[in-house]
């Protein structure tokens, strides 16, 4: 995909990449970035990242790399509770719509966990009574 992105951008690259896949796409995502581009790596769907060689992988194009997690956005219980309250209020009033990709019966909870751990799920899943 990096070659296609570079072709589409006349070899300039894109200003930012949001990569939630992880190991399988990380280095190709870096290739897509333009000079001083921003790599936002936020997931490990294909597995954890290999160690990053900053002089080889980041420095040549002066890239910026961030790996945000919820811990940086909510630094204490009060902030976390407020954030959760805000999200649930938006869900309740239809400002955020959640499409459940799979439902499991409570009796199938073990299967739900196995599917989650083996990365078979693509989206929110719920266990129902």
Regions found by a protein language model. Name each.
Residues 1-129:
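Terminal helix/beta-alpha structural elements that buttress the NAD(P)+-binding lobe
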